[in-house]
Design a protein with these regions (language model features):
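N-terminal hydrophobic/helix-forming segments and targeting peptides
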Residues: 1-287
Length: 287
């Protein structure tokens, strides 16, 4: 399976933080091709490949951002964000409410004639979505607490790029699966596709504690340079993997990754962080 095909399969199921089981059921067959598969109590997917010491843990998070239903109204539902949703981008977005069946919804927006741009951006992480049905009908299908995902998309851009829902962090999962295809080692490797990264890192914390690995590597997305972004805060597209340097990380392992990249002539970039990384590495280091 080529990388684009793998990525399309991985980005297909939703899996809003706290509801990762649906992703597990959809992808279990695919994951079983890579080793012994299980799901732990936190919802994380664990793939084990037996071997000798040192035991290596490789993490990428399975969960995605989304919303949760907080109120059902006549024709509408009120939603609260789950994870790092950028509320500047949600107006008019198409959603799927995961009730007793999947329900289509569209985020409402106040017309520009009736508001200024600043006042239309939610300050508290909530929004209202149009569901096109009465409250009575809606309550037969939707309950407060139901998770809500973004409408799925996967589109090619140019020759070898894509835009897709949930590349954060299904892209990281794709990287680890492809890496496992190429790795030829007798060392024990555990892949952790962790739950609830978007809401506090619960999955990675539990999995790292249970795995008790000798070393760990967390793979997540980062920022690519765009015309209006500060290039000092971003990586360069096609510039190679971004290797993190942070007080929360092992300097020894960061330098090891750089030396390996140099040895095998693999493009890389350094990502310098002055505190926490904002990834599961923060949670793995204390587990």
């Amino acid at each position: 399976m080529d990388t684009l095909e793998l990525l399309e399969k991985l980005t297909s199921p939703a899996g809003v933080a706290g509801e990762e089981t649906s992703s597990f059921e959809s992808l279990k067959g695919l994951f079983s091709l890579y080793g012994k598969v299980s799901q732990d109590a936190s919802g994380s997917i664990i793939i084990e490949r037996e071997g000798n010491a040192p035991h290596i843990l490789l993490d990428a998070h399975l969960d995605t951002i989304g919303f949760v239903v907080t109120e059902i109204m006549d024709g509408f539902v009120r939603l609260s964000k789950v994870g790092g949703v950028d509320m500047r981008t949600v107006e008019g977005m198409e959603l799927t409410i995961h009730g007793t069946e999947d329900i289509y919804a569209v985020v409402c927006t106040v017309p520009p004639h009736l508001s200024d741009g600043e006042s239309r951006v939610s300050k508290d992480g909530t929004c209202v979505a149009d569901i096109g049905m009465s409250k009575e009908d809606a309550e037969k299908l939707i309950s407060v607490g139901d998770k809500v995902s973004f409408k799925k998309s996967f589109e090619k851009m140019g020759e070898n790029r894509v835009t897709a829902t949930y590349i954060d962090d299904r892209g990281g999962i794709a990287v680890l699966l492809k890496a496992l295809e190429y790795v030829n080692t007798d060392k024990k490797i555990t892949l952790v596709f962790s739950a609830q990264e978007e809401t506090g890192g619960t999955g990675a914390t539990c999995a790292a504690y249970n795995c008790d690995a000798d070393l760990a590597l967390a793979v997540d997305v980062s920022f690519a340079t765009t015309p209006d972004a500060d290039p000092k805060e971003c990586g360069k597209m096609n510039g190679g993997a971004m290797i993190g340097y942070s007080p929360a990380l092992s300097r020894e392992y960061s330098e090891l990754l750089v030396s390996l990249a140099k040895e095998y002539e693999i493009p890389y970039q350094k990502e310098i962080m002055n505190g926490r990384t904002g990834t599961n590495a923060d949670h793995i280091t204390i587990s």
